[in-house]
């Protein structure tokens, strides 16, 4: 089991804790979320926020069985009732965890990469989201995430090139598919496959 704890920066008396359980008979098996708790007095007393997943909007398998891998809760310092649960997808609650909505498109659309791990809030209302596939930005009062590309962080497992055009490469990366492009124009590479790229040829 695993516990994720997040303290509200603007009011340290407000703390959220997310519990994970490993139970093959619970919610499709694997390590799934088993409870979300909230304290209003700095951790002296706790109240379970979600008691009925069927009516909360938050699926019990939101972590995809990977509770050991996902652990982050995000609490907006400008509004402690505005919280995010990071997993394969991203869910958001505006009422302190009672009801939830999906905050990003389905992971398999690749509009926002799967596997969300980090979230950061800014005073102007903007939000940054860190994923296995890079960094995304949500501007204040917007619902569209912006992919902050051209950050040179992708690590390829293996690279292949076109022998008829030696400056044209293919690179395979874990969780970030296969990308292709010209060595002289690195800003215009494109992703041609999703998932794990590994060994392009």
Task: Say what each PLM segment does.
Residues 1-201:
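Beta-propeller blade termini and top-face loops
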């Amino acid at each position: 089991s695993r516990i994720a704890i997040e303290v509200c920066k603007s009011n340290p008396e407000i703390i959220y804790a997310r519990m994970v359980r490993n139970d093959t008979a619970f919610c499709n098996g694997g390590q799934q979320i088993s409870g979300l708790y909230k304290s209003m007095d700095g951790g002296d007393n706790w109240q379970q926020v979600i008691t009925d997943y069927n009516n909360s909007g938050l699926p019990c398998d939101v972590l995809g069985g990977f509770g050991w891998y996902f652990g982050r809760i995000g609490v907006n310092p400008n509004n402690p009732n505005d919280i995010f649960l990071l997993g394969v997808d991203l869910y958001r609650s505006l009422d302190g965890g009672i009801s939830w909505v999906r905050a990003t498109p389905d992971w398999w659309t690749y509009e926002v990469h799967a596997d969300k791990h980090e979230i950061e809030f800014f005073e102007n209302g903007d939000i940054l989201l860190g994923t296995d596939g890079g960094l995304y930005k949500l501007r204040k009062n917007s619902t569209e995430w912006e992919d902050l590309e051209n950050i040179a962080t992708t690590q390829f497992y293996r690279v292949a090139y076109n022998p008829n055009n030696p400056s044209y490469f293919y690179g395979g990366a874990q969780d970030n598919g296969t990308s292709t492009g010209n060595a002289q124009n690195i800003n215009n590479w494109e992703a041609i496959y999703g998932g794990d790229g590994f060994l392009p040829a």
